[in-house]
Amino acid sequence: IVFTIPYDLTNQNTELRIYDVQGSLVAILVNQQLAAGNYVIKWEGRNQNNQNVSSGIYFYNIKVGEKVKSGKMNLLK
C-alpha cells in the first residue's frame, strides 16, 4: 500500500486499517504520527492475532488527520 502525506498534514495521527468484505477489522498496520513524505507499507496477509487470513478481497482505509482515503485490494496466496 503506497500513500503520501502532504506537508500541510505533517505530524497528524495516521491510521492504516485493513477490513474484510463484511466490514470487520482485520489489521491495523499504522497508528501513529508521521511526517510528510511517501510511505510504502507491506501487509503480510495476517490479522491482529498474527494469523494468516484467507485469499480474497480486502479494503484499506487510510486516515491522516481528518482526511480519509479508501481502496480495494485482492489478496492471493
Each model region followed by its residue ranges:
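C-terminal tail/sorting-segment detector
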Residues: I1, K42, Q51-K77
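Glycine-centered coil/turn sites that cap beta-strands in beta-rich domains
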Residues: I1-D20, I28, V40-W43, V64
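A glycine-anchored, Pro-Gly-centered beta-turn/N-cap motif
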Residues: Q12, A35-G37, S54-I57
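Solvent-exposed serine/threonine-rich low-complexity stretches and specific carbohydrate-binding patches
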Residues: V26-L34
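A short, hydrophobic/aromatic-rich structural module that often spans a beta strand
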Residues: Q33-A36, K72
